[in-house]
């Protein structure tokens, strides 16, 4: 069962390119919604994962394995968090973060943001904003409330000694590729510290893409919990929940979480990203789309939102016709989440194509 309208049947990928069942080639500026950070069929990554498939795939949570320590050794080169819970998806990372926050503080209230997206399982869905995701599944988990994103005064009013945690995306993805402003992030950090609550940064989409390992690093603020997913395994389902506090063993767990194949995928992905400096180079590849019908381009690095004056569906469709795959973030935002291996020339080629299609589409009388 698929929840998405069928558009293309893709059959193979190589680097930043994918091919459909008719043999047509596309530049992939979606990358599985930000997943394939090393592109498709990266030779080193594929080779190491093939070796792992022949060695050990799942061991079960009651056993240890060397791939976990290989992953942790690579992870420690990017972050200083003391504890990591390994799951299978971004929504699982968020569920873990919410459970850990309630366990650690003994409180129930979770504050999330308008236009936030944190996942589709019940806890993460309760923190998600858009009614189209929520309405059919009510009643959701009690104890959640939303405040306007980037509203300092609303944060001051909402965060109290009853609050277990505040969860937010440093750059809202599904919400339109909207960065948090510095004053707002600093206010969240100051208020949560003052009230004894925890600050959770959801980096499932923004992690790795903005020129720094975590987008929150741009704000010089350290959250209590960070969630990561999508690109961290370059396509193998895996997620991380990072904290500086321990959680009692047995309070949370997963059959597949932390399996050798997933840990190997993270280790190899991080090693290649670090060696090739792909995270740092992403900062230099941000493109600004210009045109009479463009309101603005926002985001950081290779997490890009192009805000239009009119709905973007026709632009997305025509770009696909011309061999470029892009995504949306609402009716009026084109979202780009390309592989980090994309070159400056290639991203500039995409920029020209997008500007050309926008001008062609909106230049028509119909």
Curated annotation (Swiss-Prot):
Q: Which GO terms describe its cellular component?
A: cytoplasm
Pathway, according to UniProt?
Amino-acid biosynthesis; L-lysine biosynthesis via AAA pathway; L-lysine from L-alpha-aminoadipate (Thermus route): step 4/5; Amino-acid biosynthesis; L-arginine biosynthesis
**What is this enzyme's EC?**
2.6.1.118, 2.6.1.124
Q: Which CDD domains match?
A: OAT_like
Query: What PANTHER family does UniProt report for this protein, alphabetically?
Result: ACETYLORNITHINE AMINOTRANSFERASE, MITOCHONDRIAL (PTHR11986:SF79), AMINOTRANSFERASE CLASS III (PTHR11986)
Q: What protein family does this chain belong to?
A: Belongs to the class-III pyridoxal-phosphate-dependent aminotransferase family. LysJ subfamily.
In Swiss-Prot or TrEMBL terms, this protein is called: Putative [LysW]-aminoadipate semialdehyde/glutamate semialdehyde transaminase
Species annotation? Pyrococcus furiosus (strain ATCC 43587 / DSM 3638 / JCM 8422 / Vc1)
Gene name of the encoded protein: lysJ
């Amino acid at each position: 069962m698929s929840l998405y309208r069928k558009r293309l049947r893709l059959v193979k990928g190589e680097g930043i390119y994918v091919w459909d069942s008719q043999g047509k080639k596309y530049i992939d500026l979606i990358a599985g919604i930000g997943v394939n950070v090393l592109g498709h069929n990266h030779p080193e990554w594929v080779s190491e994962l093939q070796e792992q498939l022949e060695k050990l795939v799942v061991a079960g949570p009651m056993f240890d394995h060397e791939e976990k320590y290989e992953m942790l050794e690579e992870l420690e080169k990017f972050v200083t968090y003391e504890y990591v819970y390994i799951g299978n998806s971004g929504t699982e990372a968020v569920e873990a973060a919410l459970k850990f926050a309630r366990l650690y503080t003994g409180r129930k209230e979770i504050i999330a943001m308008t236009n936030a997206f944190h996942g589709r399982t019940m806890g993460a869905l309760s923190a998600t904003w858009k009614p189209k995701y929520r309405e059919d599944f009510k009643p959701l988990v009690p104890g959640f409330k939303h405040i306007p994103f980037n509203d300092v005064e609303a944060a001051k009013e909402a965060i109290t000694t009853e609050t277990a945690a505040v969860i937010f995306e440093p750059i809202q993805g599904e919400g339109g590729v909207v960065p948090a402003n510095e004053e707002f992030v600093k206010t969240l950090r100051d208020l949560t510290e003052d009230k004894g609550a925890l600050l959770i940064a959801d980096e499932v989409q923004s992690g790795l893409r903005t020129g720094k390992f975590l987008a929150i690093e741009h704000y010089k603020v350290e959250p209590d919990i960070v969630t990561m997913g999508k690109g961290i395994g370059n396509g193998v389902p895996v997620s991380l929940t990072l904290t500086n506090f321990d959680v009692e063993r047995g309070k949370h767990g997963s059959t597949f979480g932390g399996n050798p194949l997933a840990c190997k995928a993270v280790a190899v992905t991080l090693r290649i990203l670090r060696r090739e400096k792909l995270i740092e180079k992403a900062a230099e590849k941000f493109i600004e789309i210009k045109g009479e019908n463009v309101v603005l381009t926002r985001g950081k690095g290779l997490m890009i939102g192009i805000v239009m004056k009119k709905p973007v569906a026709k632009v997305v469709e025509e770009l696909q016709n011309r061999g470029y795959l892009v995504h949306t973030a609402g009716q009026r935002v084109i979202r780009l989440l390309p592989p980090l291996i994309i070159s400056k020339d290639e991203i500039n080629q995409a920029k020209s194509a997008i500007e050309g299609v926008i001008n062609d589409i909106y230049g028509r009388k119909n």
